[in-house]
Amino acid sequence: MLSALGGNLSNARQSIAQVLNFALVLSTAFMLWKGVSIVSNSSSPIVVVLSGSMEPAFQRGDLLFLWNRGERAEVGEIVVYNVRGKDIPIVHRVVRSYTEEDKKLKAKKTKAGLPYVAPQKLLTKGDNNLADDTELYARGQEFLDRKEDIVGSVRGYIPGVGYVTIMLSEHPWLKTVLLGVMGLMVVFQRE
């Protein structure tokens, strides 16, 4: 009787160890993501190109690394932005930039002895598109605000690696299969 109880206790310990190991992997991945987000100053420091609008510079499925520490975006720079009200990252090139001075804010900051920098407005366009992005922006929006809309500027990429993400979003059943396989691996893994 005692040996049967000891065997069940050993199995319970193994199961708990497997669950804790899986939780450790997930929490490590989350901490790495948050760390990269803080260093890059971007809410989404790694994005996948979802369309062919930036060909030939970037292909669909390329994995992009973003940096959002610059105060200004230059014409010709490739940026990633989110349309207000939608959470879909768009990768396009800055084709026009201008600053819009807010006289009330400037007076307020000058009076307080703080430096005033006029907000930068940007117009973007995909390299493979005929027209600029004004049709993609939120209703009534003609330009992107550098501080509010830009997720980051592209600083590097790995070709094709992000295609797995595209496959998982286009074929939802693949997520189920992948999660099932991962779950079975955790359950049947023996150390």
Curated annotation (Swiss-Prot):
Main location: endoplasmic reticulum
Glycosylation sites: N41
GO biological process: protein targeting to ER; signal peptide processing
Alphabetical keyword list: Endoplasmic reticulum, Glycoprotein, Hydrolase, Membrane, Protease, Signal-anchor, Transmembrane, Transmembrane helix
Topological domain spans for side Cytoplasmic: 1-18
Record field: transmembrane: 19-39
Topology class, membrane: Single-pass type II membrane protein
EC number(s) recorded for this UniProt protein: 3.4.21.89
Record topological domains on the Lumenal side: 40-191
Enzyme class, spelled out: hydrolase
Self-association and partners: Component of the signal peptidase complex (SPC) composed of a catalytic subunit SEC11 and three accessory subunits SPC1, SPC2 and SPC3. The complex induces a local thinning of the ER membrane which is used to measure the length of the signal peptide (SP) h-region of protein substrates. This ensures the selectivity of the complex towards h-regions shorter than 18-20 amino acids. SPC associates with the translocon complex.
Notes on the domains: The C-terminal short (CTS) helix is essential for catalytic activity. It may be accommodated as a transmembrane helix in the thinned membrane environment of the complex, similarly to the signal peptide in the complex substrates.
Protein name according to UniProt: Signal peptidase complex catalytic subunit sec11
